[in-house]
Amino acid sequence: MAFVAIEGIDGSGKSTVISLLEKKLPRVYATREPSSGPIGRLIKEWALKGGSVDPHVDALLFAADRIEHYKREIEPRVREGYIVISERYIESSIAYQGAAGVSREFVKYINSLVPKPDLTIILDVDPSIAEARIRQRGGAEKYEYLSFLRKVREIYLARAAEEGYPVIDASRRPEEVAADVAELIKRVVRFK
């Protein structure tokens, strides 16, 4: 039916919004990156150990996981008539690895084997709010530093402007954010 990517900095409410969308929309298949497949599990384990000293390695691992994730999980569910909603996709690599110094061209090239989603939505929140949410849920990972989140947010907003992605104010109540996202998805699904 349709493939939707929900993007945004850590602490922007992606997981919460997606779980609300599962209740609001019919035939939703929710997934996330890193995936639950072997490469995704490797990435999660790798991140716990501090990741690579070179962000290009992280970008390559995420791209490999994304290809596998798309082919094994996303594409088949779309063909089965689901609205597949992924928490993170290519824009996460552009934003996060970009903020770590990897060129946008490199990230796009290594992700060229997977298609763009039918709709990419950016959940935007001030990094200080995001950081407070992250601390509230129990800590921070490698990429979850305030100055880093600011860089990532800047890249997301620049990409939204370049690509015409809708940007949703995620500082509001999760139910309000989910209602706005659901309306955007309904518009895309209706015209497919």
Swiss-Prot record:
**InterPro entries the record matches:** P-loop_NTPase, Thymidylate_kin-like_dom, Thymidylate_kin_CS, Thymidylate_kinase
User: Which reactions does this protein catalyse?
Assistant: dTMP + ATP = dTDP + ADP
Tell whether Coiled coil is among the UniProt keywords.
Answer: no
Q: Which UniProt keywords apply?
A: ATP-binding, Kinase, Nucleotide biosynthesis, Nucleotide-binding, Transferase
Q: What is its EC number?
A: 2.7.4.9
The record ties this protein, via Gene3D superfamilies, to: P-loop containing nucleotide triphosphate hydrolases
One Pfam family name is: Thymidylate_kin
Q: List positions binding ATP.
A: G8, I9, D10, G11, S12, G13, K14, S15
Recorded superkingdom:
Archaea
Name one cellular component (GO) term: cytoplasm
Asked whether the UniProt record includes Nucleotide-binding among its keywords, one would answer yes
Name a single GO biological process. dTTP biosynthetic process
Q: Which GO terms describe its molecular function?
A: ATP binding; dTMP kinase activity
Give the coiled coil ranges: none
Provide the family line: Belongs to the thymidylate kinase family.
- The identity of this protein, by name, is Probable thymidylate kinase
Organism equals: Pyrobaculum aerophilum (strain ATCC 51768 / DSM 7523 / JCM 9630 / CIP 104966 / NBRC 100827 / IM2)
* Taxon lineage: Archaea, Thermoproteota, Thermoprotei, Thermoproteales, Thermoproteaceae
